[in-house]
Structures are given as structure tokens and as C-alpha cells.
């Protein structure tokens, strides 16, 4: 399927160029964010960490109907989906760091999905061996919009393993994106910079 094709493209590029195999990441918006979740669960041996912007938890959308339902009001129980994602990892199971962005004004992907994605990965990473501290929430601002950052950190090291940015007033658009693009909001925190900083701290 598509995840296999994308993992294969990574292999082709790595075979042609000097790619650090320990620093390959996947991030996306909307359906692309849902695909990043799938890649993190099915190819944890390829992707070191993932970024999920306005997406859905693992297997929240298995057909058109479930996709529309999840987008409108949230997906299935995150614990259940987290266990399914862990099972999908198979012999390659490991802790996958995840950074999530979601807007409170998103009418395409309901805001509840952001917290569900984070909760799903907390469950998946816990099953993979992580011991996470209780969630810690801190307020912030960026680009003119405020946000709440919820962090789930390694209990021993304090290293953030799952982060969720809930951006106030952000619609279905890439947070901090260019004015030249579509589905972007330059008056919001710079998701690209934040994701890259998170990725840089989490090689495989």
C-alpha cells in the first residue's frame, strides 16, 4: 500500500544520496498528518519521529464513513488505537517521539482529534517501553496567536516524547505557514520550526 511505497521512496533516496538513516522523519497536514501517524506505526524502523498537524489517530479512518465521523467529532478510544499501533510495529516496536499541532477553530478536523492523537501515542509509546510522567501544560504565544503546549516527558530523563500544541483561533491551516501558500496561517506559531527542533532532538 501507500505506506510501503513511501518507505520505499525513502530507501531509494537514501541509496542515491548521503542520508543519515537515523534522522528520517515524516510530517503532514490533514490527510498527510494521518499518513504520518500510519508511517510511525508501520515503519518505526525507518522514521525516527513524526509530526502530526490537524490529523487523526492511528486507524481512526478505515473507510469514508469512519473518516468523516472522526474528522467531525473525533475517532475511537485512543487507548484502543494506541494498542493497535503498537501491534502494527511488530518486531520493530520502539518508542516513537511525536509532535502534534491542532487548531481550536478547525472545522474540518475537530479539535478533539489533536488530544486523541497525543493520547494514542502516549499509549503506543508506553506499550513500547516508555515510562512517561504526568502531562504538563504550559501556555505560550507565537505569530500573534496563543497556544497551550501539553508535554508528556520521559519520567527518568525529562525528555519530551509526545508534545501537543493546541493553537487558539487556528483553522484548518498549517500553523505559521507562508502567505504564498494555501491552507496556511502566518499569524500563528511556526510549526515548521518547532517540528524541526523536536525532530533534531530525536534521532532514531
Stretch-by-stretch model annotation:
Residues 184-204:
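Catalytic active-site module of serine/aspartate enzymes centered on a nucleophile-bearing elbow/loop
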Residues 58-159, 166-172:
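The feature captures the conserved acid-bearing segment of alpha/beta-hydrolase catalytic domains
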Residues 1-34, 41-47, 93:
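Gly/Ser-rich "nucleophile elbow"/oxyanion-hole loop immediately N-terminal to the catalytic nucleophile
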Residues 7-10, 115-122, 196, 200:
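Non-transmembrane alpha-helical segments in soluble domains
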Residues 104-109, 175-187:
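Active-site rim elements
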Residues 46-57:
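A conserved short beta-strand
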Residues 1-4, 30, 41, 108-112, ...:
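Soluble non-cytosolic domains of exported or imported proteins
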Residues 26-28, 53, 101:
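Short beta-strand immediately N-terminal to the catalytic nucleophile in serine-hydrolase-like folds
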